[in-house]
């Protein structure tokens, strides 16, 4: 009788390489799945490594465009920053990874999927909730959470089974990267008082090493979608990668954040998101120009909720779908060009224009070209302030009655 098949989210690192053997020992034929999310890793090597370790099949799927257009774009249009800081680098990729795991499992007739998450992180929740939303019949196995080995025990197991030990195993940092940015934790970063060492960064220059001359760029949007960079059309994934290089050179997008994890603990994380933070800044400025006041004031409430929903692993949920429906409605007129200066860690918006601009210079100016009806302000103020006036009159009358004993 053939062994049951299982699809493993495979990174090529020690944990998921050991997981292949560990799952085989429990009777599974393991199919490895690795996605190209724009992290720049040699994925051909990863594919071959999975097969050498013992996987019966190894998938490597380029999902950069899908990730950019269907995941990162929603976060961008929501100006999504979890707790006002974190642009959801890892949180955005997990539902897409889960989706591909399920698709391959269904294609291959697998009975289960597996991931390499520990028992104290957010990703285990994001993966497992997403998988159950997409196919509740699949079993989900978390080998690292189950085996509870020390690092030394895991290395010993790897040596015993001929599993290659990664050359970067001595690095104190735990890193996750995709085209939307790079996250870094562990090592000295676990001390919230300790300054992150420069070796913790890869995508961004320090302020000391950033150029002394700024770059000024222009980003074009159509209905909330970035479409041009300096007048040249780009697919979104490529534009993000271009901005990672340009803005990263100037030290834009470094984030040092103590965040509240879904599992109830606080965690100190260091992020590098030069492209994401530049795009969010430009997009928000274009919205300021094109959204009516009521929408502009209400949308941040939705943005905060979308960020929480994504962070908390509820991508495949009715709530997220409803929030995104509102979000899409707000983007119809978010078309135009934003000029941004990149310099010494800052993305500074210097100009914005749009055919849907609600800024009317003839109404805003204080020159002789002013067309604002100043006399209309008298009636407006009277009506606007009427509830406050009535409240004051009533309070004074009652205060007078109390003081006279009436």
Swiss-Prot record:
Q: Tell me, which GO biological process terms does this entry list?
A: argininosuccinate metabolic process; L-arginine biosynthetic process; urea cycle
In this chain, L-aspartate is annotated as bound at: 118, 122-123
Q: Which residues bind ATP?
A: 9-17, 116
Q: Name one GO cellular component term.
A: cytoplasm
Reaction(s) catalysed by this chain's protein = L-citrulline + L-aspartate + ATP = 2-(N(omega)-L-arginino)succinate + AMP + diphosphate + H(+)
Residue sites binding L-citrulline per the record: 86, 122, 126, 174, 183, 259, 271
Just give the chief location class: cytoplasm
Q: Which SUPFAM superfamilies match?
A: Adenine nucleotide alpha hydrolases-like (SSF52402), Argininosuccinate synthetase, C-terminal domain (SSF69864)
Output the superkingdom of the source species: Bacteria
Q: Which UniProt keywords apply?
A: Amino-acid biosynthesis, Arginine biosynthesis, ATP-binding, Cytoplasm, Ligase, Nucleotide-binding
Q: In which pathway does it act?
A: Amino-acid biosynthesis; L-arginine biosynthesis; L-arginine from L-ornithine and carbamoyl phosphate: step 2/3
Q: Which PROSITE patterns match?
A: ARGININOSUCCIN_SYN_1, ARGININOSUCCIN_SYN_2
Q: Where in the cell is it found?
A: Cytoplasm
Q: In the Enzyme Commission scheme, what number(s) does this protein have?
A: 6.3.4.5
Q: Work out whether the entry's keyword set contains Chloroplast.
A: no
InterPro entries reported in the protein's UniProt record: Arginosuc_syn_C, Arginosuc_syn_N, Arginosuc_synth, Arginosuc_synth_CS, Arginosuc_synth_type_1_subfam, AS_cat/multimer_dom_body, Rossmann-like_a/b/a_fold
Q: Which GO terms describe its molecular function?
A: argininosuccinate synthase activity; ATP binding
Pfam families reported for this sequence:
Arginosuc_syn_C, Arginosuc_synth
Q: CDD domains given for it?
A: ASS
Q: Does the keyword Cytoplasm apply?
A: yes
Belongs to which family? Belongs to the argininosuccinate synthase family. Type 1 subfamily.
Subunit structure comment from the entry: Homotetramer.
Q: What's this protein's name?
A: Argininosuccinate synthase
**Organism from which the protein derives:** Geobacillus thermodenitrificans (strain NG80-2)
Q: Which gene encodes it?
A: argG
């Amino acid at each position: 009788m053939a062994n049951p098949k299982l699809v493993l989210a495979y990174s090529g690192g020690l944990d998921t390489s050991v997981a292949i053997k560990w799952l085989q020992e429990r009777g599974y034929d393991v199919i490895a799945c690795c996605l190209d999310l724009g992290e720049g890793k040699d994925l051909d090597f990863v594919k071959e490594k999975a097969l050498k370790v013992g996987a019966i099949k190894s998938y490597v799927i380029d999902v950069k465009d899908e990730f950019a257009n269907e995941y990162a774009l929603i976060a961008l249009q929501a100006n999504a920053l979890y707790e006002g800081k974190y642009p959801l680098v890892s949180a955005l990729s997990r539902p897409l990874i889960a989706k591909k795991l399920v698709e391959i499992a269904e294609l291959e007739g697998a009975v289960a999927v597996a991931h390499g998450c520990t028992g104290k992180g957010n990703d285990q929740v994001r993966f497992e909730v997403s998988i159950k939303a997409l196919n509740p019949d699949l079993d989900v196995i978390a080998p690292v959470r189950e085996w509870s080995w020390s690092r030394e025990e895991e290395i010993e197991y790897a040596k015993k089974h001929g599993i290659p030990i990664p050359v970067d195993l001595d690095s104190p940092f735990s890193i996750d990267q995709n085209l939307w940015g790079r996250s870094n934790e562990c090592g000295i970063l676990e001390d919230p008082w300790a300054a992150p060492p420069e070796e913790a960064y890869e995508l961004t220059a320090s302020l000391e090493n950033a150029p002394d001359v700024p770059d000024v760029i222009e980003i074009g949007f159509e209905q909330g979608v970035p479409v041009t960079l300096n007048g040249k059309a780009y697919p979104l994934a490529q534009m993000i990668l271009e901005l990672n290089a340009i803005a990263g050179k100037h030290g834009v997008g470094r984030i040092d954040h103590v965040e509240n994890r879904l599992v109830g603990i606080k965690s100190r994380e260091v992020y590098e998101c030069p492209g994401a933070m530049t795009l969010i800044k430009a997009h928000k400025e274009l919205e300021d120009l094109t959204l009516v006041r009521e929408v502009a004031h209400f949308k941040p409430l939705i943005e905060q909720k979308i960020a929480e929903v994504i962070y908390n692993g509820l991508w495949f949920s009715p709530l997220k779908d409803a929030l995104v429906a509102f979000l899409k409605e707000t983007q119809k007129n978010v078309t135009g060009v934003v000029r941004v200066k990149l310099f010494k860690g800052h993305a500074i918006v210097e100009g914005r224009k749009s055919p849907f601009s609600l800024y009317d210079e003839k109404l805003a100016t204080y020159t002789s070209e002013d067309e604002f009806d100043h006399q209309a302000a008298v009636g407006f103020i009277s009506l606007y302030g009427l509830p406050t006036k009535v409240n004051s009159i009533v309070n004074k009358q009652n205060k007078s009655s109390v003081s006279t004993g009436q």
